[in-house]
Design a protein with these regions (language model features):
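Alpha-helical structural context detector biased toward long hydrophobic helices
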Residues: 2-279
C-alpha cells in the first residue's frame, strides 16, 4: 500500500486525524508478543521471558509468506490466474489471513490469560528430567510457571502444525473457499485497516464463514466466498470500489487505523463510513 517513498496515508479512528506516515510507524505497539515475568520490579530491565523469540519467529514466517504473496500480485497484474505461482500465492494469502486473526490482541488476550491461570494445574503432575530442567534454566524461565505456560500458549497459537489448532483450522477454511480477485480502477485504490479484512457469516462456535474480504494492495483485493459461481476476476468501477472500501470500515469490528496509498480514496471511504455509521 505504500508509495515509492515508503509512505502511506492514514486515518486514526480514535482521534479522527488524517496523517501521512511511514509503513513501520503504522499500528506499532511495543512488546505485543512478549511474555512478562510474574514477579518483577517496576524499573527492571529484564521484564520478559525469552524476549524477541516470538517476534523473531513471526518475522521468519512473514518473510516466507512475502515471496509467494509478491508473486501473486504479479500474477494479478499479468492476469495469470492459473499455475503454480498463483496457487502458492493464494495459499500464502490464506496463511496470512489466519495469522492476522489469531495474532490480533483481542484474540490473544483470553488464551494468554487462561494459560497463566491454569499453569499450576497443568504443571502439577509434570516431572521434569534433569536435561529439561537444565534447558529451562538456560532459557531464563526463573522458575516462573505462569510465564512458561503463557509462552507455550503463544508459541502453540502461532506455530503449531497440529491441524486442530485454531490458526490451522482457520487457514484450511480459507483454502476451501472460492477465491476471486478484485482490481481497482485507474485513479482509485483499495483502503485497508489495522485489521485488514472483514468476515461475514461466521459463528462463535464454528470456523466456517460465508464471505471474507481482504485488500491485498492498493490495486488488488481478495474475496473468499461459499459461492462457486463467482468469476475468478472482477475489474471494479469507481462506485463499486468506493462501496467495498466503505463496507470494509463498517464490517471490520477491530480496526484502529485506516490506510491507503493515496489520500483521495481514504478520505472518501472515511466520509462514507462516518455517514453510514451515524444513520
Amino acid at each position: 500500500f505504500a508509495d515509492s517513498s515508503g509512505q502511506l496515508h492514514a486515518y486514526n479512528k480514535s482521534n479522527g486525524v488524517f496523517y501521512r506516515t511511514k509503513v513501520e510507524n503504522v499500528c506499532s505497539k511495543r512488546d505485543l508478543y512478549e511474555v512478562q515475568y510474574s514477579d518483577i520490579e517496576a524499573d527492571s530491565d529484564d521484564k520478559y521471558y525469552a524476549r524477541n523469540l516470538i517476534e523473531t519467529k513471526l518475522s521468519e514466517s512473514e518473510s516466507q509468506i512475502s515471496v509467494s504473496y509478491s508473486r501473486l500480485l504479479q500474477c494479478c497484474k499479468d492476469a495469470a490466474l492459473e499455475g503454480d505461482a498463483f496457487r502458492r500465492g493464494r495459499q500464502a494469502v490464506c496463511k496470512l489471513a489466519s495469522n492476522l486473526i489469531v495474532r490480533h490482541p483481542a484474540t490473544m488476550l483470553a488464551d494468554r490469560n487462561r494459560a497463566r491461570e491454569g499453569s499450576s494445574m497443568l504443571l502439577e503432575d509434570v516431572v521434569l528430567t534433569e536435561e529439561e530442567k537444565a534447558l529451562l534454566d538456560w532459557s531464563g524461565w526463573n522458575g516462573d510457571h505462569k510465564a512458561l505456560a503463557e509462552l507455550s500458549a503463544v508459541a502453540t497459537m502461532f506455530f503449531s502444525e497440529d491441524g486442530s489448532i485454531p490458526v490451522n483450522r482457520i487457514r484450511e477454511t480459507f483454502l476451501e473457499k472460492h477465491f476471486s480477485i478484485l482490481e481497482a480502477p485507474i485513479g482509485s485504490g483499495f483502503v485497508t485497516t489495522s485489521m485488514s479484512m472483514f468476515i461475514i457469516g461466521s459463528e462463535d462456535d464454528s470456523y466456517d464463514f460465508d464471505f471474507a474480504y481482504m485488500p491485498l494492495s492498493s490495486k488488488y483485493a481478495a474475496l473468499f466466498t461459499s459461492d462457486s459461481s463467482l468469476e475468478p476476476f472482477y475489474r471494479l468501477d469507481l462506485p463499486h470500489i468506493e462501496l467495498m472500501n466503505c463496507l470494509h470500515l463498517l464490517n471490520c469490528e477491530h480496526w484502529d487505523v485506516a490506510l491507503s496509498r493515496e489520500n483521495g480514496p481514504l478520505e472518501h471511504a472515511i466520509r462514507d463510513w462516518a455517514k453510514t455509521a451515524s444513520n
